A protein has these predicted regions:
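Charged, low-complexity intrinsically disordered regions
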Residues: 3-67, 71-186
Length: 186
C-alpha cells in the first residue's frame, strides 16, 4: 500500500464524503480565484481525516489554520481535505498543537511576531520534509500577506498545503525568503 492508499484508507465514510463534496468544491473554487491559480481538471471527492500519516510529529506549535488538499489522478478522481479545525473536532488536538494553547480559531496565544514567524517557518519545513520523505516532489510555492500555499505531487496525486494567517501575518516577501529555501533541499 503506497502513501496515497494509506491516506485514503483512513476514511471509509463514503456517504459523508458525497454529502460534503459539493460544499468543499465551492470552497476550493473560491480559493483558486483568490490565489489566481488554474483549477485542476480532475477533481471530485475523498476523505477528511487522512493527512495525519503525512505530518511529522515534530511541530510543537501550529499558529495558523492549516488546510490540506489531496487531488488524485484516476478515472474517478477524488480530493481529500483536512484542516486544523476539523482535526481538533475529531479528537486529535494534541497531535496538531503540541503543548500550545489555542483559542476557538486555532490561533496560539502569543503576540511575539518574531517568535510566531519562526514557528510558521518551522512547521512548514517539517511538513515539507515529511511529505518529501513520503514520496512527494515540490511543484511550487505561492503566498500573500495572509496565506501561503505549498504544492507537491506524485505520479498519482497532487497535494496542496495552505497556511492561513490571521493577526500575525508577516509580509509575503519574508515568507517567500524563508520558504523558498526549502526547495533547494531537493
Amino acid at each position: 500500500m503506497d502513501f496515497v492508499d494509506r491516506l485514503l484508507s483512513l476514511d471509509t465514510d463514503y456517504r459523508n464524503r458525497l454529502e460534503t463534496s459539493q460544499w468543499i468544491a465551492r470552497e476550493y473554487a473560491g480559493r483558486y480565484t483568490r490565489y489566481r491559480m488554474r483549477p485542476h481538471a480532475d477533481l471530485a471527492i475523498a476523505g477528511q481525516r487522512a493527512l495525519i500519516s503525512a505530518w511529522s510529529h515534530g511541530p510543537e506549535h501550529i499558529i495558523t489554520e492549516a488546510t490540506f488538499w489531496l487531488f488524485l489522478r484516476s478515472p474517478n478522481p477524488h480530493y481529500l481535505h483536512i484542516s486544523t479545525r476539523r482535526i481538533r473536532q475529531i479528537g486529535t488536538r494534541r497531535f496538531m498543537t503540541g503543548n500550545s494553547e489555542f483559542d476557538e480559531n486555532c490561533l496560539v496565544h502569543t503576540r511575539d511576531e518574531g517568535h510566531a514567524r519562526r514557528l510558521v517557518n518551522s512547521d512548514l519545513q517539517r511538513t515539507f520534509l515529511a511529505l518529501c520523505g513520503a514520496g512527494f516532489k515540490p511543484d511550487g510555492l505561492l503566498g500573500t500577506s495572509a496565506a501561503i500555499t505549498l504544492s507537491l505531487h506524485t505520479d498519482r496525486a497532487r497535494l496542496e498545503c495552505h497556511w492561513y494567517r490571521s493577526d500575525l501575518a508577516p509580509p509575503y516577501a519574508e515568507f517567500h525568503r524563508h520558504t523558498s529555501r526549502l526547495f533547494e533541499l531537493l
